[in-house]
A protein has these predicted regions:
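Residue-level signal for alpha-helix termini/capping positions
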Residues: 65-66, 91, 122, 209
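Small/polar loops that bind or transfer phosphate-bearing groups
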Residues: 7, 49-52, 74-76, 101, ...
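C-terminal substrate-binding/catalytic lobe of Rossmann-fold NAD(P)-dependent oxidoreductases
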Residues: 2-6, 10-42, 55, 125-247
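Rossmann-like NAD(P)-binding element
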Residues: 41-58, 73-74
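Rossmann-fold NAD(P)-binding glycine/threonine-rich loop
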Residues: 55, 59-63, 75-100, 108-119
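Rossmann-fold dinucleotide-binding core
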Residues: 93-147
Length: 248
């Protein structure tokens, strides 16, 4: 089995190095001169990791599908506008992809803690949510994919809009997110800070292993499915689900 990582930026290199360190066959490919990957260059891979740019995701997936690849991990954010069409292409070809705004294991825990906190804060009453996110100057999307996922998880319980997220783009910070639930006399804060990209690489490896462990339903799978299986295997018989979202 061989993995091809599309994108030779910091994230792509980190994922490639993590795969190499455990003895996996991997090739990291940067952006081709033509701007599009030739499917023939992807023919050796049984799994493709996309760590490129948002606008490249649909073409990258199409090229890999044409090459015969049927397993994907998409670690790129900011391509929500093409998510439906990418999902349709995956389903029509029998391919499966794990997609996440943030593949770090700690981020998976953080997202669940935030969702549980939002449910509790809404039940108690009197709290308003706030999000602050800080990334390196060069990060293109704003708010970050993780911030948008935080909004998606908080909003069913406590109303919050993307234009209310405080966004900082400065320095070389890999990723920092703070979520606050503020009331008249107190504030609850939950914070996640990525020190480097090794955490994202660890999550990518977990997603890769999950896809190869068993046949998966064609289409897009959230990283939560990977997390659920990891937790279930480690603590059988225990329920780790987040609270049910209120009816719309």
């Amino acid at each position: 089995m061989s993995t091809i990582v599309l994108g030779d930026g910091p994230l792509g290199r980190a994922i490639g190095a993590a795969l190499e360190s455990r003895g996996d066959a991997v090739e990291v490919l940067g952006r081709p001169a033509s701007g599009r990957h030739d499917s023939r260059a992807l023919a050796a891979a049984d799994l493709v990791v996309d760590a490129s740019r948002a606008r490249a995701v649909p073409d990258n997936v199409r090229a890999a599908l044409d090459a015969g690849c049927r397993r994907f991990v998409i670690a790129t954010t900011g391509w929500d506008a093409t998510r439906v069409s990418v999902g349709e292409n995956l389903r029509s070809t029998g391919a499966a992809a794990v997609v996440a705004p943030n593949l770090a294991p700690g981020a998976a825990i953080f997202l669940r803690l935030v969702e549980q906190a939002a449910a509790l804060a809404a039940a108690m009453g009197g709290f308003e949510p706030a999000i602050v996110e800080w990334h390196r100057r060069a990060k293109a999307d704003r708010p970050s994919g993780t911030a948008r996922e935080l909004i998606r998880r908080i909003d069913p319980f406590l109303r919050i809009d993307a234009d209310e997220v405080a966004v900082v783009r400065a320095g070389t910070m890999p990723g920092h997110h703070t979520v606050a639930f503020d009331a008249a006399g107190e504030t609850i804060e939950l914070r996640l800070t990525a020190r480097d990209r090794s955490a994202y690489a660890a999550g990518a490896l977990a997603a890769i292993d999950w896809l190869r462990a068993a046949p998966r339903t064609p289409g897009i799978h959230p990283f939560d499915e990977v997390v659920d299986d990891l937790v279930a295997a480690a603590t059988p018989g225990r329920d780790h689900q987040v609270p049910a979202r209120p009816a719309a």
